[in-house]
Amino acid sequence: MDYIISPIVTEKTTLMMEKENKITFLVNRKATKEAIKNEVEARFNVKVAKVNMMIAKNGKKAIVTLAKDFSAEEVGGRMGIF
């Protein structure tokens, strides 16, 4: 099942991508941390170090921290963010 709905692109998330190697996604409300980790690793061929989740007004957000060997900016480029 596809849990990732779309990347969230704001000034704050772009700074997190550049400085902290994190990508923020809007995800399905039933998604778990493990499911998001597996989907990101499979879809983008990267290694995920950590997943933080929060429920906001507009849905559930997942902040994915990539392993140091991988670049969040490169993944963002592949998604069409940059």
Curated annotation (Swiss-Prot):
Function description: Binds to 23S rRNA. One of the proteins that surrounds the polypeptide exit tunnel on the outside of the ribosome.
UniProt GO cellular component terms: ribonucleoprotein complex; ribosome
Gene Ontology molecular-function annotations: rRNA binding; structural constituent of ribosome
tRNA processing found in the keyword field: no
GO biological process: translation
InterPro entries the record matches: Nucleotide-bd_a/b_plait_sf (IPR012677), Ribosomal_uL23 (IPR019985), Ribosomal_uL23-like (IPR013025), Ribosomal_uL23/eL15/eS24_sf (IPR012678), Ribosomal_uL23_CS (IPR001014)
Organism: Picrophilus torridus (strain ATCC 700027 / DSM 9790 / JCM 10055 / NBRC 100828 / KAW 2/3)
UniProt xrefs under NCBIfam families: PRK14548.1 (NF011118), uL23_arch (TIGR03636)
Keywords, in A-Z order: Ribonucleoprotein, Ribosomal protein, RNA-binding, rRNA-binding
Gene field: rpl23
Keyword rRNA processing: no
Protein name in UniProt: Large ribosomal subunit protein uL23
Subunit structure of this chain's protein: Part of the 50S ribosomal subunit. Contacts protein L29.
One Pfam family from the record: Ribosomal_L23
Family designation: Belongs to the universal ribosomal protein uL23 family.
